């Protein structure tokens, strides 16, 4: 998704999938690669690790191929360094920060922190902006439950289950006789489909 977003125009045009983007493709887990890949449509990208000095790289293009090639910062993520800082009471300092620059100015920023202990469940509607839902008995939408730590970082590595239930004029799309839906958490999230009632 972000690889495709990095190919879009830099200038915002009527909000139609345009504008500057920078995205760190690393979840800061024990299994994340040491090399940090950043997708961007900016002129250059700055990456700072754990509050250290930023390293800036130009966003290259590939003649006859991608308009903007992903930027790779070799050996930027070190899980053992993260662990050392966390054990030393400095877990708040552990983060990757990418800034996208156009014309020498920072225009977009993305920050990634490792997830800590799971504490919350965040529910979001997965639907297009500007698309209205109607209580007509046939509109269906997806609800996504994400397991997060206290700061709101999604806990990607966990094996929990989420039990969904609905109250009011709506129903879960499920085969369960009691109307609930149990979903395993995959990569930090679990979806459910809800049909609105006719009221």
Question: Across the structure, where does each feature detected by a protein language model lie?
Answer:
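Substrate-binding clefts and catalytic carboxylate motifs of secreted carbohydrate-active enzymes
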Residues: 1-133, 137, 150-154
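Extracellular/luminal low-complexity segments enriched in Ser/Thr/Pro
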Residues: 181, 191-198
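Extracellular Ig-like/FN3 beta-sandwich strand-entry sites
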Residues: 91-95, 138-140, 159, 187, ...
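Short proline/glycine- and polar residue-rich coil/turn motifs
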Residues: 62-65, 181-188
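Short, well-ordered beta-strand segments
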Residues: 54-56, 158-171, 180
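C-terminal intrinsically disordered, low-complexity extensions immediately downstream
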Residues: 174-176
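Short, well-ordered loop/turn and helix-capping segments at boundaries between secondary-structure elements
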Residues: 6-10, 167-169, 198
């Amino acid at each position: 998704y972000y690889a495709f977003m990095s190919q879009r125009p830099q200038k915002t045009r009527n909000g139609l999938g345009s504008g500057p983007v920078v995205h760190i493709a690393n979840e800061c887990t024990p299994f994340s690669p040491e090399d940090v890949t950043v997708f961007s449509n900016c002129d250059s990208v700055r990456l700072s690790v754990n509050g250290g000095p930023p390293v800036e790289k130009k966003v290259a293009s590939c003649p006859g191929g991608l308009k903007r090639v992903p930027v790779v910062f070799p050996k930027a993520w070190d899980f053992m360094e993260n662990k050392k800082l966390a054990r030393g009471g400095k877990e708040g300092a552990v983060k990757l920060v990418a800034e996208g620059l156009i014309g020498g100015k920072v225009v977009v920023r993305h920050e990634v922190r490792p997830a800590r202990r799971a504490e919350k469940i965040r529910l979001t509607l997965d639907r297009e902006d500007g698309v209205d839902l109607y209580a007509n008995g046939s509109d269906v939408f997806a609800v996504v439950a994400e397991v997060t730590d206290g700061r709101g970082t999604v806990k990607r590595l966990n094996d929990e289950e989420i039990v969904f239930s609905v109250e009011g004029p709506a129903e879960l799309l499920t085969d369960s006789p009691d109307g609930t839906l149990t979903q395993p958490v995959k990569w930090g999230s679990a979806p459910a489909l809800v049909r609105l009632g006719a009221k």
